[in-house]
Amino acid sequence: MSYRPSASFKIQSTDSKIHMKAIVFTKYGTTDVLELKEIDKPIPKEDEVLIKVYAVSINDWDLGLFQGDPINRLLNGLFKPKIKIPGSDIAGRIEAVGNNVKKFQPGDEVYGDLSGRWGGFAEYVCARENALALKPASMSFGEAAAIPQAAMLALQGLRDTGQIQSGQNLLINGAGGGVGTFAVQIARLYGVEVTGVDSSVKLDMMRSMGFDHVIDYKQEDFTKNGKSYDLILDVKTNRSIFDYTRVLSRNGIYAIVGGSLFRLLQALLLGPWISMISKKKICFVALKANKDLDYMNELYETGKVKPVIDRTYRLDEVPEALRFFGEGTHKGKVVITVKHDY
C-alpha cells in the first residue's frame, strides 16, 4: 500500500454552525468539477445512523456519477446532478443513531455500500442500518472500505449467477482490479482452475494472488487460443458477446459484472436469444448490496480472503485518485483515507 501526496484544495466555507468537509460536484464533467467544500454536517433521520467516515474506496460508479455517463444521467438527473457527493463504499465509526435504529449504537465500527444514496467522500455520512455491517476489530478501516461492492460482485457473480462448482475452469476478464482480486480468492475456495486476463503491469500481482494462468490481453487473445471455460466472470465486457460464447464450454455460463454501454446493450439484446438456442447461459450479475458482508467477515477473520489495496489518498486528493483509477492500471482497490482534526 502506497501513499501519493499532492497539492491540497483551498477550502470553500459556507455559513453553517456545524459543518464538515466533503467532495462536491454541481455539474457533470472531468475531475475539474470536483471541489472540496465545507458543507452542513448531516443529521440522521429516525431510521438512520450518522457515521464518522475514516475510509472510502473508489468504484466505477463514482466515475460515471460525476462524469455524467448515460446511465447515471438517467438515474441522477439529465442535465444537473441530484446527488452531489460521490462515494459509496465507506468505513467508519457510528457517532449518533436515530430513535428507530436497533442494530447499532454510537461507537460501533461499521462498513457498507451506500449505492443509491452516496455521500461517502466526506467526513460524515448518514446511512440506514441495513446498509451496514460491523467491522471486525482485526480489519483496518481501509480494508473494510475496499470490500463492499467489489467483494459482493465477486461472490455473488461466482456463487449465485455463475453457479460455480469444484473442478471447473474459470476465466476472469479484468482480473487485476477490485472485483477480480476478490474473485480469485473466493474461486480458490471452490477448487477451480482460474485464468485471469488483464494488462501486463498487473500480471505479477495476479500470480501472487493465486491465478493458475494469466494472460496479457495485448499479447494474447483468449477467445482465439483454443481453450474453453465453464464460467466466465467479465468485469470489462470489452468484446463481442459472440467472442465470449465461442470459448464457453457446453452448459457454460457467461456472468457479466460491468463494461462498456454498447457491449452491455448487445448482451442484453442478444443474450436471451443465445441462451435459448444453445446450452450456454448469458447472465448479468444483479448486485445485492451488503447481503454477504457477514460472510466476508468470516472469510477475512479466517485468513481466506484479504483486500488488495494499491494506493491510498487523502480526501483532498480525490480528483487525483479518480484520475489514477480511471487509467485502469490500479492493482486491486484504491482507497481514500479521511483524517479528522477533532
Q: What are these model-derived regions, one by one?
A:
Residues Y3, T14, L63, G68-K84, ...:
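Alpha-helical membrane-targeting segments
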Residues R239-T302, V338-Y342:
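Glycine-rich phosphate-binding loop and adjacent beta-alpha segment
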